[in-house]
Amino acid sequence: MELTYTIKRSSRRRKLTITVERDRSVVVHAPESTSEEKIRAVVESKRQWIYEKTGHVQKYALPHPPGKEMVNGESALYLGRQYQIEMVRDGSEKIRFEQRFLIPAHLSDERRQVLRSWYMDRAKEKILPRARKFAVDLGVAFANARIVDNRYRWGSCTTRDNIRFNWRLIKAPMYVVDYVIIHELAHLLEANHTPRFWNIVRAQSPKMDKAKQWLLENGQILEEEI
């Protein structure tokens, strides 16, 4: 069976690596000068590993889970807990969070986008400062950090030392958020998922295994449309 994959080349990359995204797509990250023949040979040598990864329970195909109705009595996830949604008529212009989501009733037509924007704001407020803190702890420096809308990755670290985090992470428990932050920052010390890489992550994220298991079991819930 032929393997389909996308090649992404970079003049800054020194090693060839293969990743399997959460939509089961295979991406080969290669130095600029790597020949097609070498890439094919490496992919072929990793065929069994790729099959195992694409069949992993965490890799699931579109469509994504259906969204919520966003009405009174429903709940929405935030930092690992479900909180009730309440539509209120109090003249307010934005969502308030008081151990429940208080959403202005007059914004009901835009309530999905309003809650999505609220999540984005909370992600910027909580994730980015923690990224700066953990960078200091690890003794690394990144070019910039951003919260993005990325369907298939919780986080990423580019060859230009930019780090990106999926806004949906803000729905997960904080120890899971911290694990993803540390995971991406560790790539600034070790590009590949080597034993050294995992030792770095585990030293800073004692709950690494628990966090990975949480994402394995709950990742699809984070993907629910709002």
Regions found by a protein language model. Give the residues of each.
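Active-site-proximal or metal-binding-adjacent scaffold patches in catalytic folds
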Residues: 1-179, 188-226
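Walker B catalytic acidic pair
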Residues: 184
